Amino acid sequence: MAMSMALGAAVQNERIAAKAEAFLEEQTAVLRLQKEQMQEESDLHRWSLRIRHFSDVMKVAFELSVAFIVVALAAGIGAAIWNAAHDKGVVIEAFSVPPDMAAKGLTGEVVATKLLDRLAALQAQTVSNRAASSYANNWGNDIKVQIPDTGVSIGELNRYLRGWLGHETRISGEIYHTDSGLSVTARAGSDTSPTFQGKEGELDKLIQQAAEAVYRSTQPYRYAVYLDGHNRAAEAKTIYGQLLVNGSREDRAWAYIGLDNQSLARGDFAGGTAELRRSIAIEPNLLLAYENLANNEGAMQHDEQQLAATKQAIAIGESGGDAGMEPANLPVRVLQDKAQLASSLGDFGAEIDFDRKIEQLPDRNSLENAYEGDIGACGVLHDAGCVQATREALPPSSDSLVTIGRTANLELADLFLEHWQAARDEGSSIPPLIRSLGPQADVFLRRSEYPFLAFIAANLSDFKNAHALIDKTPADCVVCLRLRGRIDAMQHRWPASEYWFRRAVALAPSVPFGETDWGQMLLMKGDFDAAIEKLTRAHAKGPHFADPLEMWGEALMRKNRSDLALAEFAEANRYAPNWGRLHLKWGETLLYSGHPDEAKKQFARAAQLELSAKDRVELKKVWTG
């Protein structure tokens, strides 16, 4: 209001107007200064807010950093405590050595390192399927030399925690001069240890002896396995005996496995089997015990017992129930067991499939067995092309055991392909190789080789030699009894043949082979109904075994029931599609049942496949293609 009045008066009076103008200029200047001050205050406030925000951020970051450091420190301490509590390794302390040796560079740390090298070598040379976790005192590959620290350090803290919470094995020792040379002692923990003495130049030998003493003290089962592998069976047996008295339950069960291996080396398969049954009584889920039992029974040609042990091994392996098996070996072992089961029941196509899977896995002493199994299985499938392809794919080997295995399986394949002269040539080279095995030779000759050599001789009409060989075979050998029956059948000695087959089936009632052979004998005799009855039983036990189906079809055809025989031949073809005789007889059945065009297809297929000389003559009679 006052400003308005002054401005109104200024209009009437020039002097007043001049004063008013001066007043307005002063007010404008004041307002401009106030505006500038307010702008500066605003800028200062914004800068202050930025500083406060940055300060808050830095405060939070600092607090987070502190928290992170605390968490990391706690985690590190926790990890150190956990590692210490689970430490089962070996720590080798620097040895006490004479000053003159140290002056030459053989310090306590150098000697400790030499001992470490020897222990690592012993471990590497010990081949066992046993899992490290099953040892009461396992240090595996965790072996290290302790280098002393000065002052307080993280290393000292870790050592303190491991000593307080862990289960590590500490090895100490000393070397000193004697009148005759040197004396070396190495001890694990508080255990006493022998002292080894020798000449000045025998230090490496003395350290090796000390390392073995430590290995025996800390890893007795592994050391026994090492000894067995280095032709020191008597020393190994002593350790196994000590484990049976003082060892853990796992050690006792595995000690019996070690004793089984020693029994086999002496050729005592029955004794080895008894050791394995003792192992199983202690540890019923010990997979390797059942697998070794199956192998022992197989070597003895105890088909029924082998089948039972193999089934039990598969059940344990598939359930993962054996913590004692080295985990890396388990997948291969399960496949091997399944291949064995398939073979025991006549499912040779499945056996080859399992072998192929094994061949795709890392070699755990498993590839050669798979290769050899393929050869035999291809032969039993009457598939000459499969045998040849498998044989050509074999990698070269100079190992005598590999030579025996491959030659024996080629002999078996040629036997089923009816290549009698080739089988005899292969078979004649096997006995000298087997005899080189030492005490085991007698078992393999009388139970695995003589029966097949006898059957080959019979098919070459050398019955005198056939009987001389087969008479050397034992009465509890199932394949021996079966081949006795087949040799007698070839001479039309029907009652004697039936006697042997009856005994074979009684010893192995769950496998299909005895009744298959029995049915074949009855087919040769012309008793078709009885043959069909035996072959039906064989098929029930081995539903994927082609031989009883093919013979069943032949029996029906010879009974003038070609209409029924067709189904048997078709089913047999599912399991042995490259069997020349099968396609020949299938074609004959089609021809007799009024299907000449279909018969020609089977005859043409037979002509492409392996046929015996007799079957090839028969093919020419029925087909002129």
Question: At which residue positions do the language-model features occur?
Answer:
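Structural marker of alpha-solenoid helical repeat scaffolds
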Residues: 246-248, 282, 316, 361, ...
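Register position in tetratricopeptide repeats
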Residues: 229, 265, 299, 344, ...
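Residue-level recognition of tetratricopeptide repeat
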Residues: 225, 261, 295, 340, ...
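Short beta-strand->alpha-helix linker/helix-N-cap micro-motif
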Residues: 85-181, 189
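C-terminal/domain-edge helix-coil "capping" segments
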Residues: 2-79, 179-180, 187-274
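Canonical tetratricopeptide repeat
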Residues: 258, 292, 337, 409, ...
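Single-residue signature of alpha-solenoid repeat helices
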Residues: 236, 272, 306, 351, ...
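Start-of-helix register in tetratricopeptide repeats
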Residues: 218, 254, 288, 326, ...
